């Protein structure tokens, strides 16, 4: 499972939807969490990759912590116009 983490409002869901559906969402709609499957080809073999779009808001940190222990890969997302979202990335390890 690929876990997408970062502060609230930085674009985690927009990036996930772009990857899955080739459609960019430009409206902010807070996510609680969602798992989206993506079929990929790795070394010539077709695989199903589960992508977990996590909530960035602090009130959902307990749910996020569970997936941080079981995730196999992590995509850390921050907003280039929000220095704090970059500085806070280390909280997600």
Curated annotation (Swiss-Prot):
Entry's localization field: Cell membrane
Q: Topology relative to the membrane, per the entry? A: Lipid-anchor
Presence of the UniProt keyword GTP-binding in the record: yes
Record's SMART domains?
RAB, RAS
Q: How is its activity regulated?
A: Alternates between an inactive form bound to GDP and an active form bound to GTP. Activated by a guanine nucleotide-exchange factor (GEF) and inactivated by a GTPase-activating protein (GAP).
Q: InterPro entries of this UniProt entry?
A: P-loop_NTPase, Small_GTP-bd, Small_GTPase, Small_GTPase_Ras-type
Annotated GTP binding lies at: 6-13, 53-57
Keyword Lipoprotein on this protein?
Answer: yes
Record GO cellular component, one term? plasma membrane
Task: Give the EC number.
Answer: 3.6.5.2
> What top-tier enzyme class does this entry carry?
hydrolase
Any Gene Ontology biological process: signal transduction
Effector region, short sequence motif: residues: 28-36
Q: Which reaction does it catalyse?
A: GTP + H2O = GDP + phosphate + H(+)
What GO molecular function annotation could you give as one example from this UniProt entry?
G protein activity
Keywords of the record, alphabetical order, are: Cell membrane, GTP-binding, Hydrolase, Lipoprotein, Membrane, Nucleotide-binding, Prenylation
The job of this chain, per UniProt, is described as:
Ras proteins bind GDP/GTP and possess intrinsic GTPase activity.
Q: Give the UniProt family note.
A: Belongs to the small GTPase superfamily. Ras family.
Q: What name has this protein been given in UniProt?
A: Ras-like protein
């Amino acid at each position: 499972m690929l876990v997408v983490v970062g502060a609230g409002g930085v674009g985690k869901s927009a990036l996930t939807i772009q990857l899955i559906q080739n459609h960019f969402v430009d409206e902010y709609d807070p996510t609680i969490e969602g798992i989206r499957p993506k079929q990929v080809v790795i070394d010539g073999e077709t695989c199903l990759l589960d992508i977990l779009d996590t909530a960035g808001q602090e009130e959902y940190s307990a749910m996020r912590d569970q997936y941080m222990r079981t995730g196999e890969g992590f995509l850390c997302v921050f907003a280039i116009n929000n220095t704090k979202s970059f500085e806070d990335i280390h909280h997600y390890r």
